[in-house]
């Protein structure tokens, strides 16, 4: 695609007197995976609804696949595949029938729809489940079927709303492998997720929003270097406040989340020496990651 597949410029949305999206601007480049991150209530769902033309913005401009939204949202959606947060597969149909029926919504002939099914089943690794009812599938199988269904129109853009929520680690990794294969085919992906590892593995760039405003944007590694820039020691114990007071002089910065104290350090040795042999304490020394960035930017954990 020669134009930006997704472009938001100074978009605002109000519900009653509450501004839920506040001057949001970002664009997604062709062939990239772009992550939209934020806590519950940050405005992610409203942003996706406006992108798809389901909800109309009060100010700003949106384009999807080169089409202005909402005025030509219906045309734009012909080139978009959507994986919703919650599966909305038809439980009365088999796996094969779910794909066939959805293909007809895009105007495909019965012959063309039937021709699509085998490669989509292969992509989703569901060949052996073609004639199974949806209720017979595992959670991971349902998510892969929903992803395959989103591909029936060979979309330029995929919009994925928390695609691996509720999946076990094995199913999540298989879903990630399928998404990477789509990126290798040149698909553009807009992804919302509560899993920082997922965002770090898949996203070329990401945008963190809070209360409808963009508070950070960039490549995952760039954000980690810019916002954290050092190692992290996680300390689990009964009195994190007391630990913070004791260890703060030896850290660049400290944060408390629940019962965990995070110490951001350039030199970990002084803290290691003070923790060694302490009863009732567990600690982990690791490189900084996107979860640390989120904690730094918002002051709280991501919530499911």
Swiss-Prot record:
Keywords: ATP-binding, Cell inner membrane, Cell membrane, Membrane, Nodulation, Nucleotide-binding, Translocase, Transport. GO terms for cellular component: plasma membrane. CDD domains: ABC_subfamily_A. It is an enzyme of class 7 (translocase). One of its GO terms (molecular function) is transmembrane transporter activity. It is found in: Cell inner membrane. The complex is composed of two ATP-binding proteins (NodI) and two transmembrane proteins (NodJ). PANTHER family: ABC TRANSPORTER ATP-BINDING PROTEIN, ABC TRANSPORTER ATP-BINDING PROTEIN NATA. This is Nod factor export ATP-binding protein I. It comes from Burkholderia mallei (strain ATCC 23344).
């Amino acid at each position: 695609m020669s134009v930006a597949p997704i472009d938001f410029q100074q978009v605002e949305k109000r519900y009653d007197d509450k501004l839920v999206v506040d001057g949001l601007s970002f664009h997604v480049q062709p062939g990239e995976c772009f992550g939209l991150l934020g806590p519950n209530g940050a405005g992610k769902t409203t942003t996706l609804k406006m992108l798809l033309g389901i909800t109309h913005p009060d100010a700003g401009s949106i384009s999807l696949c080169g089409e202005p939204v909402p005025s030509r949202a219906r045309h734009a959606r012909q080139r978009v595949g959507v994986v919703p947060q919650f599966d909305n597969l038809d439980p009365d149909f088999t796996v094969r029938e779910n794909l066939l029926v959805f293909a007809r919504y895009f105007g495909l002939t019965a012959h063309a729809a039937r021709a699509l099914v085998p490669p989509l089943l292969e992509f989703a690794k569901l060949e052996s489940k073609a004639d199974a009812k949806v209720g017979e599938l595992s959670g991971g199988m349902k998510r892969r079927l929903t992803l395959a269904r989103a591909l029936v129109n060979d979309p330029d853009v995929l919009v994925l709303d928390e695609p691996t929520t509720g999946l076990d680690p094995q199913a999540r990794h298989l879903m990630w492998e399928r998404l990477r294969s789509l990126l290798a085919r040149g698909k553009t992906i807009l992804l919302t997720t509560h899993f920082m590892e997922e965002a770090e593995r898949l996203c070329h760039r990401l945008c963190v929003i809070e209360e409808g405003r963009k508070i950070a944007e960039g490549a995952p590694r760039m954000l980690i270097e810019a916002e954290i820039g050092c190692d992290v020691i996680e300390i689990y114990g009964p009195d994190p406040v007391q630990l913070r007071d004791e260890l703060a002089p030896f850290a660049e910065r400290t944060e408390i989340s629940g019962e965990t104290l995070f110490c951001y350090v350039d030199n970990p040795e002084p803290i290691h020496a003070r923790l060694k042999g302490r009863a009732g304490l567990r600690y982990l020394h690791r490189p900084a990651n996107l979860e640390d960035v989120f904690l730094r930017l918002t002051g709280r954990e991501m919530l499911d």
